A protein has these predicted regions:
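Beta-propeller blade termini and top-face loops
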Residues: 1-22, 165, 172-364
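Active-site-proximal beta-strand/loop segments in catalytic clefts of secreted hydrolases
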Residues: 11-15, 55-58, 65, 80
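Substrate-gating cap/lid alpha-helix
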Residues: 16-55
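Extracytoplasmic/periplasmic, Sec-exported soluble proteins
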Residues: 29-36, 73-81, 239, 268, ...
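A structural signal for well-ordered alpha-helical segments within the folded catalytic domains
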Residues: 35, 39, 79-87, 242, ...
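Conserved catalytic region of serine esterases and O-acyltransferases that act on ester linkages
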Residues: 47, 69-209
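The feature captures the short pre-catalytic strand/loop hairpin that immediately precedes
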Residues: 61-72, 363
Length: 364
């Protein structure tokens, strides 16, 4: 508070929740180890006269009493688990009940926005171009990946600071509009298309103005007798359908596509417009009737239908998305796996497939 020394609070780790899954440990062995850490943390707190919060015992009680899972995998809390743990922490520190307030949802919304931007700063996807072996590659006029992408990191720093102000305003229930006008402009990148650098080949790339549209491409196909080819969908019909990277047909006969317009990753100050799309052909004329955005997902390199929903890559995570109210828009979003490779986004988890053995496969 600016008047005294900061107060130190020591928290134990949470317990390991038994989710009853054959694919996950039940947590008994882990809880024996975690209990030792909890006891050691208590001893240090008592010796140093520091505040102490026993999340290990509290979470174990919550897990036993809850009729819904509070973690995604036994050790990482889901949104409901985070909410209940927050109540435990507040009660322990303030020594009174702190009921969840509707205003907290507004705070949570801006915190998640800040977190998303910060996550793309410290865990930037396509990191090989940012920090790795390709960061020093130079293109037109000696401009390198590092020159451009490190500047983008500094842009995100400012955007995160702007959202931090929004968090504090929301906590105080003050009106606040995020203003990113103070964010440095991006560095202009000169195209190397047409042989303007060693990584470009004019012979292979040709003339950008000469690329065929979907309809123009049909006229150049050789079709066997008795067969017909139609243009089902393209980005002229549906602007959302840019850079489709995987397609699949659901049990209702609808085509789904993962579209990746931000390839190779989101650029600061631009809209994150990657999507998982549904393209139904309701009158069965061989042409998509509309384009539905099921979910916005950054770097959607692969997906597969599962458990009434969809597993989809969103580097560095694999998400489970599900529509529970029938409007074809995902209202459930669960992070199932974390830490998949994202250093080179177009080589990351893709070609999702559920095997006949019940196992989930992908290539990287």
């Amino acid at each position: 508070n600016g008047k005294g020394a900061p107060k130190i609070v020591l928290f134990t780790p949470i317990a390991h929740e038994d989710l009853g899954s054959p694919n996950l440990p039940d947590g008994k062995a882990n809880n024996s180890r975690l209990a030792l850490y909890a006891a050691a943390t208590r001893e240090v707190a008592e010796a140093k006269k520091a505040e102490f919060v026993d999340l290990f015992s509290s979470s174990a009680e919550l897990f036993r009493a809850s009729n819904v899972p509070l973690t995604i995998n036994g050790i990482h809390l889901n949104p409901e688990g985070n909410r209940r743990m927050a109540e435990v922490i507040a009660r322990s520190l303030l020594e009174r009940e702190i009921p969840a307030s509707p205003s907290l949802e507004k705070v949570r919304k801006v915190v998640l926005d800040k977190n998303w931007h910060w996550h793309n700063r410290y865990r930037a996807t396509d990191g090989n171009d940012v920090w790795g072996g390709r960061s020093g590659l130079k293109f037109v006029d000696g401009q390198s990946n590092k020159d451009v992408l490190w500047h983008e990191l500094s842009m995100i720093d400012v955007m995160v600071a702007n959202r931090d102000m929004a968090v504090w305003a929301a906590v105080g229930n003050h009106k606040h509009k995020i203003d990113d006008s103070n964010v440095p402009a991006p560095i202009g990148v000169k195209s190397n298309v047409g042989g303007k650098s060693r990584s470009s080949n004019a012979g292979k790339e040709g003339n950008l103005k000469g690329y065929n549209s979907g309809k123009e491409g049909l006229a150049k196909l050789t079709v066997p007798e008795g067969m017909e080819v139609k243009l089902f969908a393209d980005e002229k019909m549906f602007p959302e359908l840019v850079n489709p990277v995987q397609m699949a047909v659901d049990t209702r006969g609808r085509l789904w596509a993962a579209a990746w317009p931000t390839y190779p990753k989101w650029e600061p100050l631009k809209k994150m417009d990657d999507r998982l799309l549904i393209l139904p052909d309701e009158n069965r004329d061989g042409v998509a009737d509309k384009c539905i955005t099921f979910a916005r997902v950054h770097n959607p390199t692969g997906f597969e239908f599962w458990n009434g929903g969809v597993l989809v890559a969103s580097q560095p995570d694999v998400l489970f998305l599900k529509d529970t109210d029938g409007d074809d828009v995902a209202d459930v979003r669960i992070r199932l796996l974390q830490g998949i490779g994202s250093a080179d986004t177009h080589h990351a988890a893709n070609a999702f497939a559920m095997g006949a053995d019940g196992a989930f496969y992908w290539q990287s």
